[in-house]
Amino acid sequence: MNISDVAKKTGLTSKAIRFYEEKGLVTPPLRSENGYRTYTQKHLNELTLLRQARQVGFNLEECGELVNLFNDPRRHSADVKKRTLEKVAEIERHISELQSMRDQLLALAESCPGDDSADCPIIDNLSGCCHHKAQKPR
C-alpha cells in the first residue's frame, strides 16, 4: 500500500503519517525501488492505534508506549490497563479543574451588573485592584 491508501484507511493525513514516522512512533515502512514508502497491515494497525489513542487523550509519548506494547508479544494486558486508568485519572483531574474554573467564572459574571457602566467587578477582581470598592460604606 502507498501512503494515500494508508491515509484513506486510517483516517489520517499523509502529513500526519509522515510526522508519526519522523517521531519514531511507527515501524519505518519499506521503500520500493523508486523510493516510495510501502506499507503493510502492521503499519495500518499501528497508525490506527495512534489515531484512536490520540482521540481519547493520550499524548505522543504515551502513544509511543502503546505502540511499543502493541508490538511486544510478551506484553501484559495489566500494563495497558494501568496506562489507561492513569489517563482516566488525569482526565478526571482536568475535569475537576475545569469545573472549578467554570464556577469561578460564573461567580464573576454574577457579580457584574452587565450594564453601560465602566465599573466592572470582573475586571476589578481579575486585575486584583479595587477589590474593596464594592464594600465601601455609604
From Swiss-Prot:
InterPro entries: CueR (IPR011789), DNA-bd_dom_put_sf (IPR009061), MerR-type_HTH_dom (IPR000551), MerR_fam (IPR047057). GO terms for biological process: positive regulation of DNA-templated transcription. Pfam families: MerR_1. One of its GO terms (cellular component) is cytoplasm. Cu(+) binds at residues 112, 120. Regulates the transcription of the copA and cuiD (cueO) genes. Detects cytoplasmic copper stress and activates transcription in response to increasing copper concentrations. Homodimer. PANTHER family: HTH-TYPE TRANSCRIPTIONAL REGULATOR CUER, REDOX-CYCLING DRUG-SENSING TRANSCRIPTIONAL ACTIVATOR SOXR. This is HTH-type transcriptional regulator CueR. The lineage of its organism: Bacteria, Pseudomonadati, Pseudomonadota, Gammaproteobacteria, Enterobacterales.
